[in-house]
Each structure stands twice: as C-alpha cells, then as structure tokens.
C-alpha cells in the first residue's frame, strides 16, 4: 500500500501517470492475540491498551495509515508512550500474536494470514485521508517492455484478481 511512493515515482518521471493502475484495496484492522485478554474493542477505545504495536510511521506504510487513523481520533500524540514501532507489518503481527503487545494495527490481509491473532475492529475509511490502495505500473523506461505488459495483463485477469480476493484484498474498481 504505497500510493505516496507511487506518486513520487510519477513525479520523478520513473513512471508515466497514465500507466498507474490502482489494482487492490486493503483495510486497516485492530488486532489482539488469540490468547490475550483486552478491554479494547474498537479504535476509539484503544487508549485502554497497555501496549500498542504499529509499524514505524517513518518507514512503514501500514504505520503511516495507523498514525493517520489515530490522529483523526485525536489519540496519536497522547499514546506515544504505549507504542512499539515495528520495522514492518510482520514484526507488528508477531508481537501481537505472541502477546508482547496487547493490541496492534495491521492490514486485514496480514491479520488473515495468522492463526494467532483475532480482529477486534476494522478501521472506517473516514479515519483515513485516503484508502489503503495498492497501485501497480510499468517503468517508463525498461528494456523488458513486452514482459512488463504481459505481467500487467496477467495480474489484472479475472483468475488473478480472484486469487487476490482469496487472500483478503478487495479489487479496486
């Protein structure tokens, strides 16, 4: 999920704007470990948690979205002492799964990949400045234009999109 990064590539002329396809959408979710007891039920009462795992907003797109949602709720700055900042979503997921953190914020698809966490709540898109979109594009200058075109067509085929849906993504139409 990196529309900001894709836009930067367009701005730097590495990618032509007309070639960008917003292929998939994901959701941000609040999770806890299956064996963890928590009073937290929703994003709005996340302050009840002792520890909160999120991706580092400086480098992890999921962390940027988590910060956005918590900022919209007026909670981000007030909770800084409770954060464990992960270097990636998998690290956050593992902390929550092992009960090292009481709750965490990850993508829905990541939560779905673990048997050791449960989803407490989905983040309403109104808490985000933009939805969690996965854009794809070919490079403006590539020696492998034919292969790139074939790949772009392949990932947009009905059968490919069905596989993405099986993993919890929503096809962005």
What is each stretch, according to the model?
Residues 2-13, 19-24, 29-173:
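Exported/periplasmic ABC-transporter solute-binding proteins
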């Amino acid at each position: 999920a990196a529309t900001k990064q894709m836009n930067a590539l367009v701005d730097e002329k590495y990618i032509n704007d007309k070639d960008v396809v917003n292929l998939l959408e994901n959701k941000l979710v609040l999770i806890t470990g299956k064996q963890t007891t928590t009073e937290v039920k929703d994003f709005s009462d996340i302050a009840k948690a002792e520890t909160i795992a999120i991706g580092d907003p400086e480098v992890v797109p999921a962390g940027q979205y988590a910060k956005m949602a918590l900022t919209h709720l007026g909670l981000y700055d007030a909770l800084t002492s409770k954060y464990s900042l992960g270097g990636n979503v998998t690290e956050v997921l593992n902390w929550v799964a092992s009960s090292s953190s009481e709750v965490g914020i990850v993508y829905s698809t990541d939560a779905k990949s673990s048997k050791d966490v449960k989803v407490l709540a989905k983040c309403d898109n109104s808490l985000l400045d933009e939805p969690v979109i996965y854009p794809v594009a070919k490079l403006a200058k590539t020696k492998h234009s034919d292969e790139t075109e074939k790949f772009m067509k392949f990932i947009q085929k009905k059968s490919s999109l069905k596989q993405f849906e099986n993993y919890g993504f929503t096809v962005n139409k």
